Amino acid sequence: MRYDRRFCFRSLETPAMQVLVDADACPAVIKDMLFRAARRAEICVTLVANQFLRTPPSPFIKAVQVPAGFDVADARIVELAEPGDLVITADIPLAAAVLDKGAHALDPRGNWFSRENIEERLSTRAMMDQLRSAGIDTGGPAPFSARDGKTFASQLDRFLARHAPR
């Protein structure tokens, strides 16, 4: 399935990819980069969240609000994802699900999820969950940094140079 870039809706006539964003936990600076990229490359960026999201006016940017609930936004992203799409998420199981559909997955720090690394990431996540369940403090991720933002921007630009419509 494809979409009409003018209206950010898929159609059979216009080949293109879209960017889907797991927006509940996505840093604002990353959303801003995606908004600029949507206008520049004329690609559809769809933010999915269980809360209202304010987005800039653009035919290339839309927000989808889903009901609150465990993994409801993730399920909607998997439903919307098509082969070749880009999904922005830090959620490892969501990344695995969209990779299974033939989409690409990039985390907000600029790290790619791939068929080669997803099993290891899922195993590490499961191990950390077990440690937390046993009462062990595993800490959390480092705070989002300017370097993370630059890495993400670089990876996004490279991806769009190869995959965005011209």
Which residue ranges define each predicted feature?
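Nuclease catalytic cores that cleave nucleic-acid phosphodiester bonds
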Residues: 9-166
